[in-house]
């Protein structure tokens, strides 16, 4: 399934235990329909010692969440701190395909 969200887009979580949390997309996994969002769904992984890693460690990282649980946040200007949750559409302008925030109608 094609996704309209991209890396470094600002999103808000709209469902789940992190509902209302804002963050930026670190990674998009289109085949699994998931995204990794900074500061959301942080899990702890215990790494065993190995030849390459002589000491074991405990690492925290963001696990991916389903793409339907996030919404794009469109900021109208540099002073706009909160932004508006909006869907994304595409339009052709001057032989280029551009992303547009549906609520504001502005190019992303």
Curated annotation (Swiss-Prot):
GO biological process, one term: translation
Organism: Mycoplasmopsis pulmonis (strain UAB CTIP)
Designated name of the protein: Large ribosomal subunit protein uL24
Keywords: Ribonucleoprotein, Ribosomal protein, RNA-binding, rRNA-binding
NCBIfam families the record matches: rplX_bact
An example molecular function term from Gene Ontology annotations: rRNA binding
SMART domains the record matches: KOW
Summary of the function given for this chain in its UniProt record: One of two assembly initiator proteins, it binds directly to the 5'-end of the 23S rRNA, where it nucleates assembly of the 50S subunit. One of the proteins that surrounds the polypeptide exit tunnel on the outside of the subunit.
Keyword Zinc tagged: no
UniProt record similarity statement: Belongs to the universal ribosomal protein uL24 family.
Taxonomy, superkingdom: Bacteria
Disulphide bridges: none
């Amino acid at each position: 399934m094609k996704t309209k969200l991209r890396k470094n887009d600002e999103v808000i979580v709209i469902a789940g235990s992190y509902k209302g949390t804002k963050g930026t997309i670190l990674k998009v996994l289109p085949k699994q329909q998931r995204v990794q969002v900074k500061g959301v769904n942080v899990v702890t992984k215990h790494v065993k010692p190995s030849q390459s890693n002589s000491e074991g460690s405990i690492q925290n990282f963001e696990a991916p969440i389903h793409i339907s649980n996030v919404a794009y946040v469109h900021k109208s200007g540099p002073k706009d701190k909160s932004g508006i949750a909006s869907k994304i559409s595409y339009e052709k302008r001057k032989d280029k395909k551009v992303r547009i925030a549906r609520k504001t109608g502005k190019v992303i």
